């Protein structure tokens, strides 16, 4: 289903660029995704139930997503027709990836032993921006007591580990190799 999700996301992304509504589309799709996530199991059951014909699924889209822009709603209708409403979170994740790529930004998770101040997060963010070449990072601070000290940052698929836990693990590996 990941390939299908990427195709929907790509089509919506290209339409958003063509119609110059990328930011609006992202905001509305994020709101739709936020509404769908707690009801994902119900949506999956409804979507896969053979008793629910396409008209029923389209009625659900019409009533549940009033007020969203026509391009997003049209994609939801196509997804309903093809019984793909259950992959909506995957489609949003793929769309979000394209959106972030367009703006040269990404999400970063910064793990630390204690909560970092905004000033500390800004400094870490600046260092990560220099190392990754991105224009912007959306940073989330997560407390992880197992790090002992230091920080570990994840940006996309890259991990920057400056934790004491990592230092100790590297020392341990060196000892094992020299035995």
From Swiss-Prot:
Q: Where is the secretion signal located? A: none
Transport keyword on record: yes
Any one cellular component term from GO for this entry? Answer: proton-transporting ATP synthase complex
Q: Does the keyword Transport apply?
A: yes
Q: Name one GO molecular function term.
A: proton-transporting ATP synthase activity, rotational mechanism
User: Which keywords belong to this entry?
Assistant: ATP synthesis, Cell membrane, CF(1), Hydrogen ion transport, Ion transport, Membrane, Transport
Compartments in which it is found: Cell membrane
How this chain sits in the membrane, per its record, is: Peripheral membrane protein
Assembly and oligomerization: F-type ATPases have 2 components, F(1) - the catalytic core - and F(0) - the membrane proton channel. F(1) has five subunits: alpha(3), beta(3), gamma(1), delta(1), epsilon(1). F(0) has three main subunits: a(1), b(2) and c(10-14). The alpha and beta chains form an alternating ring which encloses part of the gamma chain. F(1) is attached to F(0) by a central stalk formed by the gamma and epsilon chains, while a peripheral stalk is formed by the delta and b chains.
Q: Which PANTHER family match?
A: ATP SYNTHASE DELTA CHAIN (PTHR11910)
Q: Which family does it belong to?
A: Belongs to the ATPase delta chain family.
Q: What does this protein do?
A: F(1)F(0) ATP synthase produces ATP from ADP in the presence of a proton or sodium gradient. F-type ATPases consist of two structural domains, F(1) containing the extramembraneous catalytic core and F(0) containing the membrane proton channel, linked together by a central stalk and a peripheral stalk. During catalysis, ATP synthesis in the catalytic domain of F(1) is coupled via a rotary mechanism of the central stalk subunits to proton translocation. This protein is part of the stalk that links CF(0) to CF(1). It either transmits conformational changes from CF(0) to CF(1) or is implicated in proton conduction.
Looking up NCBIfam families in the UniProt record yields:
ATP_synt_delta (TIGR01145), PRK05758.1-1 (NF004399)
- Entries under HAMAP family matching the protein: ATP_synth_delta_bact (MF_01416)
Specify the protein name. Answer: ATP synthase subunit delta
What organism is this sequence from? Staphylococcus carnosus (strain TM300)
């Amino acid at each position: 289903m990941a390939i299908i999700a990427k195709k929907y996301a790509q089509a919506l992304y290209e339409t958003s660029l063509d119609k110059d509504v990328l930011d609006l589309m992202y905001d509305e799709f994020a709101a739709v995704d936020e509404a769908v996530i707690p009801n994902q199991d119900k949506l999956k059951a409804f979507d896969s139930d053979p008793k629910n014909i396409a008209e029923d699924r389209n009625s659900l889209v019409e009533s549940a997503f009033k007020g969203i822009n026509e391009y997003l709603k049209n994609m939801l209708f196509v997804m309903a027709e093809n019984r793909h409403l259950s992959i909506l979170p995957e489609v949003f994740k793929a769309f979000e990836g394209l959106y972030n790529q367009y703006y040269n930004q990404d999400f970063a998770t910064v793990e630390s032993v204690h909560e970092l101040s905004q000033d500390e997060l800004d400094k870490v963010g600046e260092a990560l921006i220099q190392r990754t070449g991105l224009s912007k990072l959306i940073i989330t601070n997560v407390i992880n007591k197992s790090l002992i000290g230091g920080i570990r940052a994840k940006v996309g698929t890259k991990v920057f580990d400056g934790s004491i836990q990592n230092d100790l693990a590297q020392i341990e590996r060196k000892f094992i190799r020299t035995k």
